[in-house]
Amino acid sequence: MNNRERMRASNKLVREWLLQNEYDQIWFKPHTKRTDVVFTQGGKYLATDLWNLFDGICLSTSGFIVFLQMKTNSWAKEKPLKDFVKKINGCFILSFNVTNKLKGCNGKYKVFVRDYQ
């Protein structure tokens, strides 16, 4: 399986996990050659993800916007996620590790989740 196919398979597992856990309006940012221009008070920058951090967004059952960070076979770096949560009021983040390498996976890809608020 090439990287793009693995990413799509991981996204599918995360999407299924989100739906099973009653999240709604799930949207994943497509990874393309084109980047988005993000304008800030200090200038602008190019981003392939939402703020170069998130792979998607969804809504919780409580009506909160939840930012999604997905990785295959590793966890996302915590510092940028924790820094983002500190700056944004009412921010919720779900970080996913889709892997077959941890104990209990038995060679099958499984979804592991960390949350930040």
Question: Across the structure, where does each feature detected by a protein language model lie?
Answer:
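Catalytic phosphate/metal-binding cores of nucleic-acid and nucleotide-processing enzymes, i.e., regions
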Residues: 1-117
